[in-house]
Curated annotation (Swiss-Prot):
Primary gene name: trpA
Species this chain originates from: Allorhizobium ampelinum (strain ATCC BAA-846 / DSM 112012 / S4) (Agrobacterium vitis (strain S4))
Any Gene Ontology CC annotation: cytosol
Name assigned to this protein: Tryptophan synthase alpha chain
Pfam assignment, any one: Trp_syntA
EC id: 4.2.1.20
Amino acid sequence: MTQRMDKRFADLKEEGRPALVTYFMGGDPDFETSLAIMKALPQAGADVIELGMPFSDPMADGPAIQMAGQRALKAGQTLVKTLDMAREFRKGDQATPIVMMGYYNPIYVYGVEKFLDDALDAGIDGLIVVDLPPEMDDELCLPARKRDINFIRLATPTTDEKRLPMVLQNTSGFVYYVSMNGITGSALPDPSKVAGAVGRIKAHTDLPICVGFGVKTAEHARLIGASADGVVVGTAIVNQVALSLTKDDKATADTVQSVVTLVRGLASGVQTARLAAAQ
């Protein structure tokens, strides 16, 4: 639903701080643990949840997220189960926006119309499908928009002034600015360059700009959040899950709590981001 996403960003604008957008892989390391992580994220400080859809060939993802996807698939995670996870979450939380993130192939195999109907029923607010360019909007973007599901696009440092309006044309919810070229989990970008890029995109759209790739600590979140409307953290969370597991990739008593601790720290950075910008 577009209203839930719009309300969240409007409320945060009133508070004078950026959003903390947290990504985790659905089903990693197993369904129950992953669901427990998802349920714990809002209380830990997450404002928007990105729910990863595991896929066997995740070309844009770094090793950490690739391995998380493999763990999830090995544990039996499917697109049906990922939707079920969102549905279970919604029983206790009607306020936190959920964005499903992944690749087109599993959705295509599932059936686009059925997927969108089921996503709406499960309480999904938006989609990020990294391998569907604007030229393919008829495939999924426009049908999603007709159902009031946001379709969130990625912009990069190489998205030039000519390309940017096309990227933004049917985008809703927010714009995800990938602050560095390459795969997920790369080094932290230069905050001043990020601020310049955010300003450049804002000249073309009123949508919130969320910045990701490379944010791992509260200080990173504070620096990026000084100019962005949202700070996206994914690889750091996925790495924390991996570090908490046994040698055979099973959850431990510390798995959920270790993610909560990390996210609380990141949230503290986001909450002081505007103070940093004002100094």
